[in-house]
Amino acid sequence: MGSAISVIIEMISYLSEISSVTGISVEAILSGEAFAAIDAQVTSLITMEGFLGAETALSSIGLSEDMFIFMQAAPELTSTVMTEFVRESVQTAFIFQTVAGSAAFSLGSLHGYLAHEVPIVNRNMALIPRRPADYYDILFPGVQSFTHALDVIHGWGHSLFQSVGEYIWDTLRRETQGAVESAVRDLSLQTTHQFLDAIARMMENSRWVVTNLPREAYSRIYGGLQNYYAELPGINPAQRRQIERALEYSNRPSIEDANSRQVLEAELGRPDVQRRSQQQEDSSSWFESGANIMRYFAPGGAHQRVTPDWMLPLILGLYGDISPTWQTYIDEVEYGPKKKKRRFQ
């Protein structure tokens, strides 16, 4: 009997201490509602806030591990102690009532009570009226957010650190992503401009030749005439002698031609004349396939870039600036010719 009373006194003192620390009523602790609420809060802190363990989460709300264990065992411990207390009380009363002559009545009345040592009452039954989290906010709109703003002690430091950390992380991620995208875009533009600039400079410094297409056409025509005359039948001897006399008369040199021929034959023995004549023969046997376009440089040695007029639209187009004519052609290709507005008479 004395041990049960001492245990009850210690439980009452410990319950008072926990109630003063947490602000939870003693009835809620004994019924188990306090442990369920604290357990849910600790789980939320570990899951959502990122605490490393239960001890850290308990210390953040002002509880120790012993208090948490006591709150867990309080309902069962209370039931056990009270049962033991009742049993010892009944035994004591039984002794006194036996002495007084009422043992039979006490034994008969207490036997039915002691047959239900485990209580059949629902332990999850609410002992206090349940109020939702937004109860006062429903009655007085805005009061919950106002009181939360005034409560600068409970969770203020951790919330501030978390908010500042999230802001710094979001800013760093956003700036890093923007810097990477800008660097990739600038690199692609720079590479494209360098490639187009290299093509433009190569075209400016290249040697351009206009192919002589008429000469090739004439050679094909005269080749066909030559084949035509080659297939004609031969001439008779009288016609041949007549043609030879005509050619001999046309090729007869005059006095000036004879004098120049004598001078040339006299100089043929010199080495420089022989070399010059050999070069003339070589040059006459070789001919170009087209006409070379002369390249003009900047006047005065300014070493500036020079582009012919016929190449200027192409060079400007490589640098992104096109002529109005070219722009009109592109618009017609992409969007089609402009439709003329029909005039109504």
From Swiss-Prot:
Region DNA-binding, residue ranges: 329-345
GO biological process: symbiont entry into host cell; viral penetration into host nucleus
Record's GO cellular component terms: host cell; host cell endoplasmic reticulum membrane; host cell nucleus; membrane; viral capsid
Keywords assigned by UniProt, alphabetized: Capsid protein, DNA-binding, Host endoplasmic reticulum, Host membrane, Host nucleus, Late protein, Lipoprotein, Membrane, Myristate, Viral penetration into host nucleus, Virion, Virus entry into host cell
Residues with lipid group (N-myristoyl glycine): G2
Region (D1): 289-324
Pfam families linked to this entry: Polyoma_coat2
Domain of life where this protein originates: Viruses
GO MF: DNA binding; structural molecule activity
Keyword Membrane tagged: yes
Motif Nuclear localization signal location, chain numbering: 336-344
Assigned protein family: Belongs to the polyomaviruses capsid protein VP2 family.
Record's protein name: Minor capsid protein VP2
Organism in which the protein naturally occurs: Hamster polyomavirus (HaPyV)
Lineage: Viruses, Monodnaviria, Shotokuvirae, Cossaviricota, Papovaviricetes
